[in-house]
Amino acid sequence: MKIPGIKALTFDVGGTVFDWRGAIESEVQRLSDEQGADVDARQFATDWRIRMFKDLELVKSGELPPMNADALHRRALDEVIDKHGSLELSVSERDELNQIWHRMKAWPGAVDAIHKLREAYTTTVLTVLSYAIAVDCSKFNDLSWDGIMSCEFMDHYKIDPQAYQQGAKLLGHRPDEVMMVATHTVD
């Protein structure tokens, strides 16, 4: 089924296509079990994600220098580990944990659905995640896109309307010809 007037689909991937929570919880639980630490992996994952988005707001306001999601996640991780004090990780272990964002699994059915949608639409990523995260997770899940747009290369971050407008322009379409696909209402 083709939606009249829509030529391209831009996908949020962190949560919509890839299960960030499951990846983080699983890895934090594994590390916690190895250390015999008492860490609520679900809360840790939530705190990490929230802290990253708070830091992103500081980047957007100019209070922090420009940095991509890899650097934002790594910065946020230090604060979250301090909050969940029973998990002790060296700098190199923290760097390795930060790489879990590059190995998020796709939700069941997502890969097949996107491949099917590519038959009718240009399908791309439009994300605040880094280009490297989007590429690595796509490869990890054998997921092909027509393009990947990371806000790290744009002048604006989602949910700023100009990020969506710039994405449409990069695709050669008017904004009304591009549909954002996301599982949260802010997009």
Placement of each model-derived feature along the sequence:
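Glycine-rich phosphate-binding loop signature in dinucleotide/nucleotide-binding domains
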Residues: 2-4, 119-120, 170-177
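A short, structured active-site edge motif that brings together acidic residues
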Residues: 44-45, 144-156
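Short acidic capping loops at alpha-helix termini that bridge into adjacent secondary structure
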Residues: 41, 144-147, 174-179
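Short alpha-helical
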Residues: 23, 105, 131-133, 186-187
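Conserved SAM-binding loop
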Residues: 17, 126, 180-181
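N-terminal helical cap/lid subdomain that shapes the substrate entry/recognition surface
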Residues: 3-108
